């Protein structure tokens, strides 16, 4: 009798994706973040579902419904903070996952990479709309500032903003639709993830050496299932430590003040994981220019496969490119810091220089480094 795992139509799909999947024998811990993102997504959907049972998307009651969840719902506080800090964990894993793709040349799987970019945009949109829902000061003003950026689009900008708002300002209609989108988007992310994996399994995984590993494959289970479970345990440990000891560490104190359209907070800023993009947006004095820079700061990932000049796939044996990669990491950390600072000297000029460096690394330095390394290796 043949194994049901290999014959049943549904079990067969799971088997070919998670059990008998041939995987390279040398993939490192940097390959753990894909599965960790899956864990984060499931956690966010589960906690979000329970929060949605008690949340009301009305401007008069949204803030007090969050208070009600934290005070009156059984373990509501832990569900709320797991959801809020789970988003931070999600983005940490996302940045690591994208960084891994850049370092080891995984972007050459263009279909997988492009679906990944769409996923990144979708997750960012979901997180932004989720931040608006508690209807605190930073929620309201963050929504106002970011949605207002659409008005920079020539000719249709103003109409577009009012269409998104559902009125002439951020109000009840905006909150209601943001809640609706915030609820549906994770399921769209889930579907896109399935497509992401579908394309990945067409080519198989990349590995640290960047050399095809067809001659040296091992089954995904038990080797990588154990490895992924260890990663998930460490992620859970980090998240529960954050939730139980300092749940508000990554949040903004202003969001504990109910939204007030008549009082602007001194420093409007998004959650920490958007600060790098926010710093790039602010570094350009022109509104449309800033919006374009903001969009291209993420969209630039789509043209990276076209700018790959090296004869080697990954950066494992390319010291010049390695230096540039870590310069990029340092630059992103600098931008994150600048995004949280007020718009004044010297932060403005640091932000502008860091923004220029960010685009220069991708568009100029990386391709040149690839050409230099090709010549150095005398191929």
UniProtKB/Swiss-Prot annotation:
- Gene Ontology terms, cellular component aspect? mitochondrial inner membrane; respiratory chain complex III
Which terms does the UniProt entry file under GO BP? Answer: mitochondrial electron transport, ubiquinol to cytochrome c
Where in or outside the cell?
Answer: Mitochondrion inner membrane
Gene3D superfamilies, from UniProt? Cytochrome Bc1 Complex, Chain C (1.20.810.10)
* A GO molecular function held by the record: ubiquinol-cytochrome-c reductase activity
Q: Which residues bind heme b b566?
A: 97, 196
Q: Which cofactor does it need?
A: heme b
Transmembrane stretches in the record are: 33-53, 77-98, 113-133, 178-198, 226-246, 288-308, 320-340, 347-367
Instruction: Provide this UniProt record's keywords sorted from A to Z.
Output: Electron transport, Heme, Iron, Membrane, Metal-binding, Mitochondrion, Mitochondrion inner membrane, Respiratory chain, Transmembrane, Transmembrane helix, Transport, Ubiquinone
Q: What else is known?
A: Heme 1 (or BL or b562) is low-potential and absorbs at about 562 nm, and heme 2 (or BH or b566) is high-potential and absorbs at about 566 nm.
State what this protein does: Component of the ubiquinol-cytochrome c reductase complex (complex III or cytochrome b-c1 complex) that is part of the mitochondrial respiratory chain. The b-c1 complex mediates electron transfer from ubiquinol to cytochrome c. Contributes to the generation of a proton gradient across the mitochondrial membrane that is then used for ATP synthesis.
Which proteins does it associate with, and in what oligomeric form?
Answer: The cytochrome bc1 complex contains 11 subunits: 3 respiratory subunits (MT-CYB, CYC1 and UQCRFS1), 2 core proteins (UQCRC1 and UQCRC2) and 6 low-molecular weight proteins (UQCRH/QCR6, UQCRB/QCR7, UQCRQ/QCR8, UQCR10/QCR9, UQCR11/QCR10 and a cleavage product of UQCRFS1). This cytochrome bc1 complex then forms a dimer.
> Mind telling me what this protein is named?
Cytochrome b
Q: What is the lineage of its organism?
A: Eukaryota, Metazoa, Chordata, Craniata, Vertebrata
């Amino acid at each position: 009798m043949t194994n049901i795992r290999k014959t049943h139509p549904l079990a067969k799909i799971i088997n070919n994706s998670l059990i008998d999947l041939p995987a390279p024998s040398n993939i490192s811990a940097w390959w753990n973040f894909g599965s960790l993102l899956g864990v984060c997504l499931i956690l966010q959907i589960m906690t979000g579902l329970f929060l949605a049972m008690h949340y009301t998307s009305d401007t008069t009651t949204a803030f007090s419904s969050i208070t009600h969840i934290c005070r009156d719902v059984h373990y509501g506080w832990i569900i709320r903070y797991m959801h809020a800090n789970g988003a931070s964990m999600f983005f940490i894993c996302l940045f690591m996952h994208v960084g891994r793709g850049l370092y080891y040349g995984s972007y050459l799987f263009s279909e997988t990479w492009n679906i990944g970019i769409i996923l990144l945009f979708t997750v960012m949109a979901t997180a932004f709309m989720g931040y608006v829902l508690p209807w605190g000061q930073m929620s309201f003003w963050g929504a106002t500032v970011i949605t207002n950026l659409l008005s920079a689009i020539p000719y249709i900008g103003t109409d577009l903003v009012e269409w998104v708002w559902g009125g002439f300002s951020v109000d009840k209609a905006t909150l209601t639709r943001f809640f609706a989108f915030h609820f549906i988007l994770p399921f769209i992310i889930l579907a896109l993830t399935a497509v992401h994996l579908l394309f990945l399994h067409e080519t198989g995984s990349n590995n640290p050496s960047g050399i095809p590993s067809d001659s040296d494959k091992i089954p995904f289970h038990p080797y990588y299932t154990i490895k992924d479970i260890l990663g998930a345990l460490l992620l859970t440990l980090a998240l529960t430590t954050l939730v139980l000891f300092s749940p508000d560490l990554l949040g903004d104190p202003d969001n504990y003040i109910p939204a007030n359209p008549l009082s602007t907070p001194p420093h409007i800023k998004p959650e920490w994981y958007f600060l790098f993009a926010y710093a790039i947006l602010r570094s350009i004095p022109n509104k449309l220019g800033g919006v374009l820079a903001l969009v291209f700061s993420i969209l630039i990932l789509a043209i990276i496969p076209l700018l790959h000049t090296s004869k080697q796939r990954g950066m494992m044996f390319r010291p010049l490119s390695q230096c540039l990669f870590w310069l990029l990491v340092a630059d992103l950390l600098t931008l994150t810091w600048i995004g949280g600072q007020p718009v004044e000297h010297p932060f403005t000029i640091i932000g502008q220089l860091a923004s220029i460096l960010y685009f220069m690394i991708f568009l100029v330095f990386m391709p040149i480094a690839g050409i230099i390394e090709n010549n150095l290796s005398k191929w």
